[in-house]
């Protein structure tokens, strides 16, 4: 029987029931719904709605139901209940009879689902923070292993300046640390308890909402009942945090896909995160990374979905808000598996140092060093930049790197150049001169790793 059936004389159509029911999605809130119901039993007992004995019986039945269902969603879905709240109430009534009908006194599904969803976001958010920390640790460990491995750094996907692989790793550590901070902040704002807000105007019973919030491990109760049941900012913020983090994961995946390509050959991926071709026996495809990149789009789609759903809803609750869960659940599932997979990829990644070094030595990546050398000799940087551009054009025509040009050839472009130019054009010099906080010099990267390991 529907929780709202008394108002209606006609039967619900089978098509409408299929369209309206949310149990196939919101069954994932079962644990939170039971936990919230246990707290609500205590709350209504405290104001005399039920006796202490009745409260004890209700709580025992709810805990029994929690144990019976366990982690098997089919136990819930197969019942055909309208939603998770209906399922719990129906099962409770089956266990304790009419006493089960008292539990919903003073409570609406509006504040009930808002509470369930926040509890779920808090639990899953904590698990996501742990996953982000694991990924961060893998990146730091990889940076430490490859702290001095040289590779080209890119702008516009053109070789720009040499960097170390450790420096590349730490760039993504910074990104994922921002993701950690962003999610942590979002969870702080979600840490408010809507229970006791009723349908929209507040419960009619003198519930101590501070005690209720504390019982459910919320930081505090919400402060406006109308906002409490209308708010889905926590869903939006979790999807937003996921979208930004997936952007970072996708960028990292794209870098690694390129580094792993035959054209670059800077890294090798482990067999356990790659697959082959059904036709071409030689193939070893970076499928894990490509799927991370691909799943980013579906996470973005869910963020846009909830934003679009919420953008024009009048206060307070509207049935549109039932659409908040499917996208959220998919976002959390996608983000979680991508974080796990990225950590696994990094744990087995090997840097091919020789090809990476050779690539860093090509493409005139030391041109900036020559410009800096001329500046040190007294030439204004803009003029030095122009001169070195001409040197690069000449070197290309000679099919030689800058460091292989003779002193006479170099002096044809700038009389300031002398024999001491050549030590400045080595890869080692290029790296060591970036000895500034945040730079790619090996000692700076090593120092940064040490700090990250302590954090």
UniProtKB/Swiss-Prot annotation:
One Gene Ontology MF term: argininosuccinate lyase activity
Secretion signal, residue range per the UniProt entry: none
CDD domains: Argininosuccinate_lyase
EC identifiers of the protein: 4.3.2.1
UniProt name for this protein: Argininosuccinate lyase
Gene3D superfamilies in the record: Fumarase/aspartase (C-terminal domain) (1.10.40.30), Fumarase/aspartase (Central domain) (1.20.200.10), Fumarase/aspartase (N-terminal domain) (1.10.275.10)
Pfam (any one): ASL_C2
Disulfide topology: none
Organism expressing this protein natively: Shewanella denitrificans (strain OS217 / ATCC BAA-1090 / DSM 15013)
GO annotation terms (biological process): arginine biosynthetic process via ornithine; L-arginine biosynthetic process
């Amino acid at each position: 029987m529907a929780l709202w059936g008394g108002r209606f004389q006609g039967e619900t159509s089978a098509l409408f029931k299929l369209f309206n029911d949310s149990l196939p999605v919101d069954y994932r809130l079962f644990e939170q719904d039971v936990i919230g119901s246990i707290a609500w039993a205590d709350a209504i007992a405290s104001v005399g709605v039920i006796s202490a004995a009745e409260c004890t019986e209700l709580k025992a039945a709810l805990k029994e139901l929690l144990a019976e269902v366990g982690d098997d969603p089919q136990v819930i879905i197969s019942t055909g209940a309208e939603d998770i709240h209906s399922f719990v109430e129906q099962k409770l009534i089956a266990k304790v009879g009419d006493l089960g009908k008292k539990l919903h006194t003073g409570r609406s599904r509006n504040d009930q689902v808002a509470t369930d969803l926040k509890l779920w976001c808090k639990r899953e958010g904590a698990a996501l923070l742990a996953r982000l920390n694991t990924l961060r640790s893998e990146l730091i460990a990889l940076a430490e292993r490859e702290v001095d491995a040289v590779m080209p750094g890119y702008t516009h996907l053109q070789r720009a300046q040499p960097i170390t692989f450790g420096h590349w790793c730490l760039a993504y550590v910074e990104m994922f640390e921002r993701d950690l901070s962003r999610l942590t902040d979002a969870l702080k704002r979600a840490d408010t308890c809507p229970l006791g807000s009723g349908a929209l105007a507040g419960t009619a019973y003198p519930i101590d909402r501070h005690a209720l919030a504390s019982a459910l491990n919320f930081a505090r109760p919400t402060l406006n009942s109308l906002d409490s049941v209308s708010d889905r900012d926590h869903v939006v913020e979790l999807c937003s945090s996921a979208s930004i983090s997936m952007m970072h994961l996708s960028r990292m995946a794209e870098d690694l896909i390129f580094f792993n390509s035959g054209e670059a050959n800077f890294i090798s991926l482990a067999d356990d995160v790659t697959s082959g071709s059904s036709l071409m026996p030689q193939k070893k495809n970076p499928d894990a990374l490509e799927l991370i990149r691909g799943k980013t789009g579906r996470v973005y789609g869910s963020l846009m979905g909830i934003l679009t759903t919420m953008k024009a809803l009048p206060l307070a609750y509207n049935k549109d808000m039932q659409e908040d869960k499917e996208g959220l659940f998919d976002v959390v599932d996608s983000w979680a598996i991508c974080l796990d997979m990225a950590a696994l990829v990094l744990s087995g990644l090997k840097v091919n140092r020789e090809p990476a070094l050779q690539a860093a030595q090509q493409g005139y990546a030391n041109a900036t060093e020559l410009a800096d050398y001329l500046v040190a000799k007294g030439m204004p940087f803009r003029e030095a930049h122009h001169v070195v551009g001409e040197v690069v054009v000449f070197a290309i025509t000679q099919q030689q790197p800058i460091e292989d040009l003779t002193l006479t050839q170099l002096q044809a472009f700038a009389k300031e150049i002398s024999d001491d130019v050549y030590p400045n054009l080595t890869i080692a010099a290029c790296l060591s001169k970036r000895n500034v906080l945040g730079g790619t010099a090996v000692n700076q990267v090593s120092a940064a790793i040490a700090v990250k390991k302590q954090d």
